[in-house]
Amino acid sequence: MNHSVNWYFDFISPFSYLQFKTFQRLPNSLDIRLVPILFAGLLNHWGQKGPAEIPSKRTDTYQYCHWYAKRHGIPFRAPPAHPFNPLKSLRLAIALNTTHEVVDLVFNYIW
């Protein structure tokens, strides 16, 4: 029996990148529908700052992500500027039907 789930993501998030890279470990019977969102829109709606906007959280987040990536054998490098505006990347993914291949290419380019 096949199951499907919606996976909401933003290219700005290192956690989205790391989770996406683990999808190949999931059963083939699981259909993951990729749903791009603008994380900043959620943060703004709730009056919050993102972790990358708070220096101490940014440092801890990067350290944790590097540790997690190394532990799981996932290539990881922080983009030259973070936070950055992911809107063009999200629009590109949507224009190209948000396929796993497209999302993988964009994540690999950024992270």
Where in this protein do the model-derived segments appear?
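Structural alpha/beta surface segment adjacent to cysteine/selenocysteine redox centers
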Residues: 15-111
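Short active-site neighborhood of thiol/selenol oxidoreductases, capturing the structured segment around
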Residues: 2-14
